[in-house]
Amino acid sequence: MTDIVWHQHSIDQAARGAQKSQNPVLLWFTGLSGAGKSTLAGALERALFDAGFHTYLLDGDNVRHGLCKDLGFSLSDRDENLRRVGEVAKLMVDAGLVVLSAFISPTRAERDRVRALFPEGRFIEVHVSTPLSVCEARDPKGLYVKARSGEIKEFTGISSPYEAPTAAELTIDTSRGDLATQVQAMLAYLTAIEVIDANKLSALA
């Protein structure tokens, strides 16, 4: 038995979203290191922000400077990292925001656990499916070189598995096409499911 109960607010998620002329959701970008998750999420956020939508981007590196700075990279710490991010994202969605997150999140169980925090339609999984060979060739942080040499243990895609989504709402391979086209495809999807109003995008154009 616990004395902790939910405090019901007079203003709900729908009201907060309506005030901002948007339907709040979480877009969860998942994929290998170097796949282009942060680039895609950042470009989409910029397009949404410029059109007048209310957004926030949670990035895998950034949260480790504060929210998760006490965590390492063991399997249990990585799991806790994503648990915290999922809970923070839920609060932000409840606040009426369109939230974007960019995390490798290598297992289906981790991603499904975050999905379970949200009502149907409020969690959008974006699989950034860029092939390992392309990600390794990019290697923007030099992590693949360290993983191949054994300097980094349990590195996703090399010495630790990545479980690709089986039913992602969106799949984007950043080695095909250009960033602007990919952003437009994501905006079209968000418009189709009525997360955002096409009229606001038209006004921006």
From Swiss-Prot:
PANTHER family: ADENYLYL-SULFATE KINASE 1, CHLOROPLASTIC, BIFUNCTIONAL 3'-PHOSPHOADENOSINE 5'-PHOSPHOSULFATE SYNTHASE. It comes from the Bacteria. It catalyses: adenosine 5'-phosphosulfate + ATP = 3'-phosphoadenylyl sulfate + ADP + H(+). ATP binds at G31, L32, S33, G34, A35, G36, K37, S38. It holds the Pfam family APS_kinase. Pathway: Sulfur metabolism; hydrogen sulfide biosynthesis; sulfite from sulfate: step 2/3. GO terms for molecular function: adenylylsulfate kinase activity; ATP binding. InterPro entries: APS_kinase (IPR002891), P-loop_NTPase (IPR027417). Keywords: ATP-binding, Kinase, Nucleotide-binding, Phosphoprotein, Transferase. Catalyzes the synthesis of activated sulfate. The active site is at S105 (phosphoserine intermediate). The keyword Nuclease does not apply. NCBIfam families: apsK, PRK03846.1. Belongs to the APS kinase family. Its EC number is 2.7.1.25. HAMAP family: Adenylyl_sulf_kinase. This is Adenylyl-sulfate kinase. GO terms for biological process: hydrogen sulfide biosynthetic process; sulfate assimilation.
